């Protein structure tokens, strides 16, 4: 019994530590655990071919420079809010409730209306739920690279 308890305590500790290492952002008073897309391959793949995403999850795309960005929904099976942030983590553009697209390479782009460095994709409806307005600040948790 004592070994079992020791094992249980160790397993719980390890799972808590693993959860603490997951990158996160805060926006509008809500915390989202995010996957990071920091290179060209990860940014190109994005959330393609995913059937669902938990409500408290998202993907943060980190670009090398702040410039106009455009995203599309090719092979993306989840309707999304695409949120664009500048070097200072300020929301500069929003594409809300972006629908699925089955047109392959003919899927339309969803551009930023201003130069952006970071792009956060959340499940469609999150921006409305948070009542986001341009100028909202995105807070980074530990381990997310800052603009240089």
Tell me what each language-model feature is.
Residues 1-5:
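Bacterial N-terminal signal peptides that target proteins for export
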Residues 18-148:
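Compact, glycine-rich, soluble single-domain proteins
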Residues 6-15:
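Bacterial N-terminal signal peptides
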